[in-house]
């Protein structure tokens, strides 16, 4: 879109038109990458885009950081296999969405990434998670007994020596204690541990992590909200 066309459109219209060109949906990061801000008289265009997607009646939120056009709602939800009344379909999409974000962040930090076999064909936007994950098979960084635990963790980041630096478990409705038990088994590695969940589960996390059995890892496990 040329600058003359941009001058005739409001900022909201420009955001909507950009989302159309992206297929009717986009992450906030993607919008900021492809938007032409040359005619915007603001020093903080990214903040303006955030305000627009949050307030526009023409745009709806699929997940935090992921937005779509109301005019394309049915098409987009079918594309992502989301049935709004089906809690399970929403959970499956959300789980893969946050796994995909974690894989992308790992790449930005120049780390290698892994997702477990059972999740590799789940969709992150228009790609399967396997396309974002560096390792199809988890690196053999320890004994088989511990690898069996590690290979079920939702996302792992590895350094250049193929040693794990970060373990992430994405929790929607499953028992957080199960994830903490995995981290407990993996505590001897020089790694950080994270539970990624809705903020409404933070009290549950605090209750579980304060159990005496998890005292050796309490200071190393962090809770991250969506």
Predicted regions and their residues:
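Anion (oxyanion) recognition and catalysis
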Residues: 20, 107, 187
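Positively charged, polyanion-binding regions of nucleic-acid-associated proteins
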Residues: 2-29
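Nuclease catalytic cores
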Residues: 49, 78-117
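Charged low-complexity interaction tracts in eukaryotic proteins
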Residues: 2-11, 38-84
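Catalytic cores of nucleic-acid endonucleases
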Residues: 133, 139-153, 159-225
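Amphipathic coiled-coil/heptad-repeat helices and related helical stalk/stem segments
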Residues: 11, 98-99, 151, 179
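A short acidic, leucine-rich amphipathic alpha-helix
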Residues: 30-35
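Active-site metal-binding core of divalent-cation-utilizing nuclease and nuclease-like domains
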Residues: 85-91, 107, 115-162
């Amino acid at each position: 879109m040329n600058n003359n066309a941009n001058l005739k459109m409001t900022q909201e219209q420009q955001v909507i038109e950009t989302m159309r060109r992206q297929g009717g949906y986009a992450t906030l990061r993607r919008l900021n990458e492809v938007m032409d801000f040359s005619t915007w008289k603001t020093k903080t265009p990214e903040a303006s885009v955030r305000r627009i997607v949050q307030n526009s009646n023409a745009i709806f939120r699929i997940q935090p950081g992921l937005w779509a056009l109301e005019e394309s709602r049915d098409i987009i939800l079918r594309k992502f296999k989301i049935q709004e009344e089906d809690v399970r379909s929403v959970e499956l999409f959300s789980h893969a969405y946050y796994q995909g974000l974690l894989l992308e962040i790992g790449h930005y930090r120049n780390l290698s990434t892994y997702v477990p076999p059972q999740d590799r064909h789940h969709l992150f936007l228009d790609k399967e998670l396997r396309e974002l994950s560096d390792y199809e098979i988890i690196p053999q960084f320890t004994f088989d007994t511990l690898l069996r635990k590690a290979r079920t963790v939702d996302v792992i980041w590895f350094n250049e020596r193929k040693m794990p630096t970060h373990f992430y478990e994405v929790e929607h409705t499953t028992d957080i204690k199960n994830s903490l038990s995995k981290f407990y088994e993996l505590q001897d590695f020089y790694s950080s541990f994270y539970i990624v969940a809705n903020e409404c589960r933070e009290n549950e996390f605090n209750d579980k992590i304060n159990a005496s059995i998890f005292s050796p890892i309490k200071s190393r496990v962090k809770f991250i909200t969506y």
